[in-house]
Amino acid sequence: MKTDTSTFLAQQIVRLRRRDQIRRLMQRDKTPLAILFMAAVVGTLTGLVGVAFEKAVSWVQNMRIGALVQVADHAFLLWPLAFILSALLAMVGYFLVRKFAPEAGGSGIPEIEGALEELRPVRWWRVLPVKFIGGMGTLGAGMVLGREGPTVQIGGNLGRMVLDVFRMRSAEARHTLLATGAAAGLSAAFNAPLAGILFIIEEMRPQFRYNLISIKAVFTGVIMSSIVFRIFNGEAPIIEVGKLSDAPVNTLWLYLILGIIFGCVGPVFNSLVLRTQDMFQRFHGGEIKKWVLMGGAIGGLCGILGLIEPEAAGGGFNLIPIAAAGNFSVGLLLFIFIARVVTTLLCFSSGAPGGIFAPMLALGTLLGTAFGMAAAVLFPQYHLEAGTFAIAGMGALMAASVRAPLTGIVLVLEMTDNYQLILPMIITCLGATLLAQFLGGKPLYSTILARTLAKQDAEQAAKNQNAPAGENT
């Protein structure tokens, strides 16, 4: 009798253990619906704000250009007005950043990476208005900046805002919604949903906590952001370069050569960005007056440059289709490339609220097209199309500089709708990334974040040192 009872109890214990194992297995893939709902809200808000930011920047640019058109026949008014308008707009952006939210300067992507590791604050009530209005000023002034950095930072801050509004306390929700907003922001800037997802997984891989909950939330946010973008802007690719021809197998070695070139250019470009940042820091020394006046001078010069050589100013989206179509000579392409390198360094490294993705894409297009046109002359038997090298170059500089080849490949293919060029894109971006790494180049955003954290630690140490002894105990 005791034996039967013991056997029955043992069987019951085994059944309970199996049920518990099955229950845990089923719950392992159970995503809290609240987080998915919040991710959808974050994606929708980011899409709406991203579209509003794009329209606002275009409105400021059109107003500025319209004012210049009114005095186009009077040179003595045109040139001073071009400088003054752009200078004033730029000064608005610099002043707001320096006065109210220093973390809103630059692209903002390193700030999101730092926030994902709980190393940087997320003051959304300050960053959102400063980044939006400040970006309207600097981008509207015609400075060589992109809107993708602002939308990524805006998206991440919207994620934290939603978290605070709905009073969600868990660390998982805080991290997930921040990453969701950042991914939705990139998607809203470029109409590139897959690139937005890959950007979080690849570029922010050291900070992103990859699990089923977070990745589902990122997918949900990106979907909603993309839907909102396409409702307002349609489904056409953001950069119209037309359908380019395929790259024959016997020409693929040329794309590897192009990747090697960008593998050398990427680390040099990153080094120049950091050195220019140091130069500006030595100039203004943190004084707001000097910083704003310096920003106004850079903005005014961009306004003048926009009259002399329009292709050398602005984010570069209008330049890319023109350059990729082969409308410039090799010499002119290289001249514009050098001019835009200088203006990109001045605008981005000065701390203006604006991104560097779009300027890098334009630089890659210019150098890639120049290489393609030269290769077409040297190897006429291949019947090369320079535009295919322009597409490959767009992603290659980003791959070598940011060290995110997958994001660069997919982003360019989504933006141009030339998916047939995926093989030459892979070859070029992989070659650029490997050589940049071999040469000792560091990812741009990670390096900027490290410098920001070092500065933050130094400021905190100085504050603690200057504080009265009683306050430190």
From Swiss-Prot:
Motif (Selectivity filter part_1): 106-110
Alphabetized NCBIfam families for the sequence: PRK05277.1
Gene Ontology MF: a single term: antiporter activity
Organism expressing this protein natively: Salmonella heidelberg (strain SL476)
Keywords: Antiport, Cell inner membrane, Cell membrane, Chloride, Ion transport, Membrane, Transmembrane, Transmembrane helix, Transport
Protein's recorded name: H(+)/Cl(-) exchange transporter ClcA
InterPro entries the UniProt entry points to: Cl-channel_ClcA, Cl-channel_core, ClC
Subunit comment: Homodimer.
